[in-house]
Amino acid sequence: EFYRTIILQSLKLKKFDYALNIINGYKKDLHPERRENMHLYACALYNFYSGNFEEALSHCQRVKLNHFALKIDLKSLMLMICYELDQEISANSIIDSFRHFITNNRILSVAERRKQKSFIEVITKLFMLRRSGNLSYGYELKKLIANDLPYKKWIEEKLLDLKVIKRKDRK
């Protein structure tokens, strides 16, 4: 949806006031069946990009997954939040359900399925790298992020935090 795209791009550009105006100002224009869930998801995104991870998670947990595209977006966001909050056990549960969803869903294209599986693999390896400090996971991650991945910039930031890549290595 256009609402989601505008908010996501605004947040990626750190235009928080603009995003908040869109989130609240255009809620009434959303389709009534999706309005509340899209608004909750938008609030979760806003809080995630603002660094309010607990609040972001709270919004995510209130979303009812009745919209196909939202399921993928929400699970990805929840995985990133779990990483930020160092909640590996919760992340493992989400990873398991996300894998089943991707594997069993025939609506997703092969390319989209591959992209989402790669994202899950990256998140899994990020947790392993942070927990173990084993740089071999980092080198595997560097190879994986060369591909088309959702939230690639966020992943690169996490690799920077873990000292796997240097600023000049980012594309």
Language-model-derived ranges and their functions:
Residues E1-L30:
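Long, K/E/R/D-enriched contiguous segments that form extended
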Residues E1-R4, P32-A42, A69-L74:
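Generic helix N-cap/helix-start motif at coil->alpha-helix transitions
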Residues I89-K171:
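C-terminal non-catalytic interaction modules
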